[in-house]
Design a protein with these regions (language model features):
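C-terminal amphipathic helix plus adjacent low-complexity
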Residues: 363, 368, 373-428
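Conserved donor-binding/catalytic core segment of Leloir-type glycosyltransferases
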Residues: 213-231, 237-241
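Aromatic "clamp/platform" in nucleotide-sugar-dependent glycosyltransferases that forms part
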Residues: 295
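N-terminal subdomain of nucleotide-sugar transferases
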Residues: 1-68, 118, 240-243, 401-428
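Donor nucleotide-sugar binding/catalytic pocket of nucleotide-sugar-dependent glycosyltransferases
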Residues: 143-154, 161-206, 216, 223, ...
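Short hydrophobic beta-strand element within catalytic cores of glycosyltransferases
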Residues: 312-316
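Nucleotide-activated donor-binding/catalytic signature segment of Leloir-type glycosyltransferases, i.e.
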Residues: 257-282, 289
């Protein structure tokens, strides 16, 4: 079996959520099949500038084919197109122009997919909202499997995507909430399975090694990821500072990751910057609780890693996916206001027995659903199932409307469609 993993960026040093997801899946599927990665020469997700060399290289034993991006992203143009499709009645042509302006637009990548359709048994496309996934899925619909990595934002309200969701052979969902959201906007029951992603956790993390290396003695909560307002960090800083003004105790907040948002200059808040995987996992194992303040997630690998290490999670309950994961695992608490944040953090800080119980629950949940043998088996079983599927039972990709139909401004704003999508965690 030969599989092409198609993703917007790829590399050992590229750690975006979908890109890391794609790399992990590619490397693990390569143990069972012949895997090629098809990607662009972009390193930066804001500009899509061609910083990496076109051609073929090997990364961790997986062949990677890079294709140039035709043009960098222009933020002003993308913002104008986004305002049109998200906030105004518009046409399908407006949505296609938005997709082009978002990028990364690589005609060479799409030509390779079209001309090599017979070379691969399956094309595994990552991230439904990008140019390569939309046009690539249309080019090889009968071999297309989509990993949507969809978040609850206005993009899911665009009319261009339901035909793709209904027309690919299968979808590999990250969560029950993602599947429910996409099935609602597609107006159909979509073929696929909830799979998520595994993680390369150390067998024996050493919490004390982290404490000694970084001089940490007091109890602490930890945040791991990009320190950005879009990830909920501005609210996290406000809530945590209010909590330590109101509550007694010595719990610190430690931050691991690159900072886009300024970190408050406060004695109880400490930014460690970018650290090695060894230090990251030691830190997560040493923490009393991992805080996940993000409003938008399709899975949250960091929360799963915390549970895999036996650390409870405190999550933003306004993110349906995080709330659902906490409820299904019984490994964490969630909040939707400062008062709930303070009560939950106080309960976790003051009760080792609660932390231990939730940590055990989270670890059991991780081992049941997110170890790599489980993830690999779900992918391989899906490919085997699709290979056996009679051609008459396969979905077909609806063609794009004609010239004039594409230009009729009859589509509702993406934000309006999103407002009609049911919210809430899905309990299973």
């Amino acid at each position: 079996m030969r599989i092409a993993v198609v993703v917007q960026r790829y590399g050992a040093e590229i750690n975006g959520g979908a890109e890391l997801h794609a790399r992990y899946v590619a490397e693990h599927l390569a143990r069972h099949a012949e895997v090629d990665v098809l990607t662009t020469c972009a390193r930066d997700y804001v500009t899509w500038e061609n910083e990496l060399r076109a051609g073929v290289e090997s990364i961790n034993g997986v062949p990677v084919r890079r294709f140039p991006v035709a043009r960098p992203r222009t933020p002003e143009l993308f913002a104008r197109h986004s305002a049109t499709v998200f906030d105004q009645p518009h046409s399908l042509q407006d949505e296609l122009a938005w997709l082009d302006s978002e990028g990364p637009t690589s005609p060479a990548l799409l030509r390779y997919i079209e001309t090599n359709a017979g070379t691969y048994d399956w094309f595994l496309f990552f991230s439904y909202r990008y140019h390569h996934a939309y046009h690539g899925s249309r080019a090889v619909a009968k071999k297309a499997v989509l990993v949507p990595t969809a978040e609850r934002d206005a993009t899911v309200g665009l009319a261009m995507f339901p035909p793709i969701l209904r027309g690919v052979r299968a979808l590999m969902f990250n969560s029950f909430e993602e599947r429910a959201m996409l099935q609602h906007v597609a107006g159909a029951r979509l073929p696929g399975v909830i799979v998520g992603i595994g993680s390369e956790l150390p067998e024996r993390p050493q919490p004390e090694r982290f404490r000694q290396r970084f001089g940490v003695q007091d109890p602490f909560a930890i945040y791991v990821g990009r320190i950005d307002e879009n990830k909920g960090c501005k609210e996290l800083f406000a809530f945590f500072q209010q909590h330590i003004r109101n509550a007694r105790g010595r719990m610190q907040l430690l931050l691991i990751g690159n900072s886009i948002l300024p970190v408050p200059d406060h004695p109880m808040i400490r930014h460690l910057g970018f650290v090695s995987d060894e230090d990251k996992f030691d830190a997560m194992a040493a923490a009393d609780v991992l805080i996940m303040p993000s409003y938008y997630e399709s899975l949250s690998m960091v929360a799963l890693e915390a549970w895999g290490l036996g650390t409870p999670v405190l999550a933003n309950g306004r993110c349906d996916v995080l709330k659902g994961q906490c409820l299904r695992s019984n490994g964490g608490l969630f909040y939707e206001s400062y008062s709930e944040f303070g009560e939950a953090l106080g309960a976790l800080a003051s009760s080792p027995s609660i932390r231990r119980a939730m940590g055990r629950n989270g670890m059991a949940y991780f081992r049941r659903h997110y170890t790599w043998p489980v993830i690999e088996r779900k992918y391989l079983q899906m490919f085997e199932q699709l290979a056996r599927e009679p051609e008459g039972q396969q979905a077909s990709m609806a063609p794009l409307p004609g010239y004039f139909a594409r230009r009729k401004k009859v589509l509702p704003p993406g934000m309006k469609v999103l407002a009609g999508v049911p919210e809430g965690a899905v309990l299973q």
